[in-house]
């Protein structure tokens, strides 16, 4: 299935518009963020950001199949196979086959191609009109020079999605006026500054907070020293932020460092991580926690996001010479 998806994405990539950035070789998050951030007059534009609710599982297969057939007209056997796969209502759940509305099977490699294909017409419409727009699977952002024009384009999106049997997640809709911060794909942009989005900062801080509490309980239960608990915290977040050799998830370094041009959010995360480490090492939230010095953290293996960020860009500058 992975090989089939790879071949589909490569062979039929010309079907897709350049304003689509999901699951495309050499045309992904970095290209999306930079295209938007460096668009002429971007700081004078109004924006609208939307997230399609439960996109993969909500795509009506009966509406998708005609699009798929048109996309691969010279592959009747492949279309027949994919049709049977998509129309089969049975799924495995707890080892049992049960009927379910599965859409295009979120989590299946094939779903990435189908998710790109289903809204390709919307992408093409915005491209044809030369309207600034970007889509990454179920995330859409559009821009316009006036509030009235923005509303007109928003209505096109709402109407198109309704015709496609899709809904927008109202909790993830946002609008901005010229000069205000807009967010797309985890990056916040304002006045030429690209930073980690506030929600992404809060998510990593929440993970640090939960891990600190878990390690405190573990240390109490196993009679582990505070310093060893702090060392465990450092090991976990070094792996999550920088290394991650086991998981397929992108680390912070791989995802954010090429995209941002400020260390503002990294300073905030560093400061919070150091608070957690001090709390674990000293078993206190008071000022006495500062008796555990930064040099001691480094001896335990702590790596600052800010330092690693500047090292990354220093190496990149050297590679560009």
Model-inferred region functions:
Residues 1-69, 73, 79, 90-93, ...:
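Conserved two-metal-ion catalytic palm core of "right-hand" nucleic acid polymerases
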Residues 2, 95, 99, 124, ...:
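Right-hand nucleic-acid polymerase module
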Residues 6-13, 101-105, 147-151, 233-237:
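A broad, low-specificity signal for short, low-complexity segments enriched in glycine/proline
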Residues 18, 33, 38-137, 141-160, ...:
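Conserved polymerase palm-domain catalytic core
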Residues 24, 72, 159, 207-208, ...:
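Short, intrinsically disordered/low-complexity patches at protein termini
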Residues 26, 103-104, 108, 259-266:
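Conserved phosphate/pyrophosphate-binding and hydrolysis machinery centered on Walker-type P-loop NTPases
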